[in-house]
């Protein structure tokens, strides 16, 4: 595997996305940071540059088809191919809502408009970007699509009363990750005869802005499994945790 491989990371201005970029840059990969807020993206770019690293940055709201196409055109013009797509961008609830996450994410108290807003980014944005990048990934010797998922998206774990995540019933977010898992399964089958492998990775409960300070894992620990999927190409077509344990769909 060439250390000059080109990697696009969505939601890379903070948390897992930023740390994943940092670890991959230190391994010699060419990393493109992307996020929807250009100011925050440039701050992340400058932070990594101050650490002696050299990423690129492009503004990218994955729920905006025009920005998705602009990202494709920029990467095609700059590099001519893409080796790894890391679908990290996601939201747990509706951005700028005046309701609490619990209110907007619960099946009975949330409404369809709120669930749709979550799906626009976590599901349809992820799918639109992935499909747009396929021609560039096809040019790679070993293309990889890494979808950031969650154990909360496992139907089996959500249904089992003995599961540690049984009582976490955030319908909007959880069901969006269930669909990300389904996208992973379908893509792996559709691309079986190509050079592209597809992965679903649950980095665990990480101390990010989304995961909160109550989480069990530090950000570098969560990012490490994403990096491992890139470098070791483990678990193609499957859903696994930061311990490399398989998770039931």
Give the location of each predicted region:
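Canonical Rossmann dinucleotide-binding motif of NAD(H)/NADP(H)-dependent dehydrogenases/reductases
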Residues: 2-32
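Conserved glycine-rich Rossmann-like NAD(P)H-binding loop of the short-chain dehydrogenase/reductase
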Residues: 27-43
